[in-house]
């Protein structure tokens, strides 16, 4: 991508938009950043320091004089400004697409509905450990928080860019070409963006491997029914080596693709000759701070990537045994009077809540709720009825939750998280857990799940 001398519009003034603007200006483009709403003071300071033009609280006609446009992931394809860009025949790219054009490092792309951040963090941990031995650096970028654009020019050819990708980021990634790609799972989420069409959502995820070539590797989860149907049965052609990981029992049809599995208590890699190479014992990597079948699946995914990158088994074992989990993902906040308090604010859909309910031992008090995303709680009803001694429903969706579970488990509905924590503290007994797993978006009261999780932890510490 040649950007020197080009006029570029960046739509959206969040972290990725500002990072893209700074990168493009550094590479010689003339940039206008345009934000429909307000810009943060930090964003304005960074843009002013770099002498980048910007506008906020609306879009002017200037934005349509660009050679191309960088579209922030939160702006949907149906937004009027996007449709106007297309009407003006202005090419639209994601921030990921732009950054990848200037990336010298090896790229690992990770997407999926759940498990992206934990798996990306595991992969980054493996690469950091291997990099210390072999003289390269690992960069964890993308949807996890640090924009790809802000780090890409520092990356060297032997480095590794571990890139977490949402479906939104992949939509406008036209030529993005990771050497290793991974899909953790695909379950219903964000369907409002995709016209309630699950296939359209999946196809956005599948963009991750579309530009891969014969020497590259695509990795998928055989335990996910949608992925197994698409790739295990070869319904969708993949242009590179395709390998799988999984926990469920194998069939002969699956065996030829499964590379990483559990044999007894051991995570193993199946070699080309069928021999099993041990990597790490399950009970060495799973613990109170990092537990559950879903996290074991995340470990298998990371090992599959490590194997594709040529990371040695001993390096992987040492790195995995030292891993302590990721903030806001079944994070053990504190143990108070024999009660474990667990922050799972990242559970923004019902499937993520299900994983937490399966991982945390009964009995528990469950705090759930927020901005509903068309949730169907029937898929977790059996777990809640069996394991939850009290459901505290909070946020905008509290009445929907309370109505659905009325008569199934004891339910209390309160407006706010701090009220929910106070009630849980009064009711919890030694040997129980308090699990905060909202199954909803955070936008009813918070800017993001991180802010929500931090508030929950603050509330917990106040009752210490």
Swiss-Prot record:
Protein name: UDP-N-acetylmuramoylalanine--D-glutamate ligase
NCBIfam families reported in the protein's UniProt record: murD (TIGR01087)
Pathway: Cell wall biogenesis; peptidoglycan biosynthesis
MF GO annotations: ATP binding; UDP-N-acetylmuramoylalanine-D-glutamate ligase activity
Function: Cell wall formation. Catalyzes the addition of glutamate to the nucleotide precursor UDP-N-acetylmuramoyl-L-alanine (UMA).
GO cellular component terms listed in the entry, alphabetical order: cytoplasm
InterPro entries: Mur-like_cat_sf, Mur_ligase_C, Mur_ligase_C_dom_sf, Mur_ligase_cen, MurD
Catalytic reactions of this protein: UDP-N-acetyl-alpha-D-muramoyl-L-alanine + D-glutamate + ATP = UDP-N-acetyl-alpha-D-muramoyl-L-alanyl-D-glutamate + ADP + phosphate + H(+)
Predominant location category: cytoplasm
Subcellular location: Cytoplasm
Top-rank lineage group of the source organism: Bacteria
Protein family according to the UniProt entry: Belongs to the MurCDEF family.
Annotated gene: murD
Gene3D superfamilies: Mur ligase, C-terminal domain, Mur-like, catalytic domain, NAD(P)-binding Rossmann-like Domain
Binding site for ATP: 112-118
Keyword Ligase: yes
EC number(s) per entry: 6.3.2.9
Keywords: ATP-binding, Cell cycle, Cell division, Cell shape, Cell wall biogenesis/degradation, Cytoplasm, Ligase, Nucleotide-binding, Peptidoglycan synthesis
Top-level enzyme category: ligase
Pfam families: Mur_ligase_C, Mur_ligase_M, MurD_N
GO biological process assignments: cell division; cell wall organization; peptidoglycan biosynthetic process; regulation of cell shape
